Amino acid sequence: GLCLFKINDLTNEMEILDTHLINIRKPDHNYDYLEERHGFETVRMLRLEDELDRYLTEKISEYQCIDLLIYESHFFNVRRPTAAIPLVRFMQVTERACVNHGIMMVTVSPQQMKRTIGISRELAKADKFAVKTKIQALIDRRMIHFTGSLDDISEHEIDAMGIGYTQMIIDKLLVDNPS
């Protein structure tokens, strides 16, 4: 999930410009030959890279500049360490896209995001509904300006909003006004 935003210094709001879900689950027959020769995981990374590059190119053209990409750091079940491999590969794809487009990249952990948006440490494994509820509360408090409905976007795009909000609080570009 991707979330493109800017900070409004006058209103102290994170203004959501766009959200996007990279969906490579639906078949794309343009990649069939490559998949036969190189396997599913390699083609999955190629598709992710192509989609991310298309999105960044389009948004840089539209907004003239993207300064920072905030990436949710890896988390995986330690009982299945091979699950980390595609996550690391996708981070490499993302880093390469950032380098190619002149965008700085930082990472934020899911736990740090959850604490920043107001989920207690005890609920570190909070479900998606808890995250959605807290993001909606930030929208209601006008910390995040989003003209759409959270019901119309994916949980990954909602997470991306939380990750972006967290980094802006860390960088002190937003001041959280609990009310």
For each predicted feature, which ranges?
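Phosphate- and other anionic-substrate recognition elements at nucleic-acid/protein interfaces
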Residues: 1-179
